[in-house]
């Protein structure tokens, strides 16, 4: 991996996976299991640096979690510094879709809702067990990986870490889990309000 990251790469529009307010995500041109996140020219990398510090803390403690995508390091690109992450894919090889995609495509959601309900319960329990620190849980920052284990898997791909000057959640699993309780309450409320889906049992609510 060190040898790979030491070599500059060229990213092209055809490799674009998604683009947000802060940065864009591209397929890695040499590794199909990786993606490269690059900040837009008018944005700084403050949020990403915060996130990377949290990843380094996790790895320094020799711990990880199957609920978050892996981080591998930086690599120079023609668009500036790239941050290289695991690219979450379905068993078919397709890039896994975000929860936002599933919830906006109701027929697709209905097809998978039974397994998604089970996978969500496992996701929630695992995050609490691992005391993962996240700024917020958002439907476009979580993907549902089809074909993983019997019921698929939810994975956070963005917005990890804490923006607090003193990130106390890093030092106390109890405090981290207290924060997670609020994060999940906000997340489930948001899903209900925006998509009319009660995430606790994954049923679409009619108006």
Residue spans for each PLM region:
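Conserved structural core of kinase catalytic domains
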Residues: 65-115
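ATP-binding glycine-rich loop module of kinase domains
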Residues: 10-61, 171-176
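Catalytic-loop Lys-Pro-X-Asn motif of eukaryotic-like protein kinases
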Residues: 137-144
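Conserved hydrophobic "DFG−1" position in protein kinase catalytic cores
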Residues: 27-28, 38, 73, 87, ...
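Active-site ExK catalytic segment of metal-dependent nucleases
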Residues: 35-41, 86-88, 158-160
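A short catalytic or substrate-binding loop motif that flags glycine-/basic-rich loops and adjacent residues
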Residues: 17-20, 64-65, 76-77, 136
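A short, low-complexity linker immediately N-terminal to eukaryotic Hanks-type protein kinase catalytic domains
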Residues: 1-13
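C-lobe/activation-segment region of protein kinase-like
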Residues: 105-115, 119-121, 126-132, 144-207
């Amino acid at each position: 991996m060190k040898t790979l990251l030491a070599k500059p790469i060229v990213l092209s529009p055809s490799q674009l996976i998604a683009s947000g307010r802060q940065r864009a995500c591209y397929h890695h041109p040499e590794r199909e299991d990786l993606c490269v996140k690059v900040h837009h020219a008018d944005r700084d990398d403050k949020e990403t640096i915060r996130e990377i510090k949290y990843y380094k803390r996790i790895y320094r403690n020799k711990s990880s979690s199957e609920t978050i995508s892996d981080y591998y390091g930086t690599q120079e690109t023609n668009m500036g510094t790239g941050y290289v992450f695991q690219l979450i894919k379905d068993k078919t090889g397709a890039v896994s879709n975000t929860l936002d995609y599933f919830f906006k495509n109701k027929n697709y959601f209905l097809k998978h809702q039974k397994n998604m309900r089970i996978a969500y319960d496992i996701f929630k329990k695992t995050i609490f067990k691992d005391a993962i620190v996240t700024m917020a849980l958002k439907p476009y920052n979580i993907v549902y990986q089809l074909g993983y284990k019997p019921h698929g898997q939810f994975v956070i791909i963005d917005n990890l870490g804490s923006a607090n000057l003193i990130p106390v959640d890093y030092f106390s699993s109890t405090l981290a889990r207290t924060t997670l309780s609020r994060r999940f309450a906000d997340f489930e409320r948001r899903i209900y309000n925006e998509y009319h889906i009660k995430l606790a049992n994954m049923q679409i609510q009619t108006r």
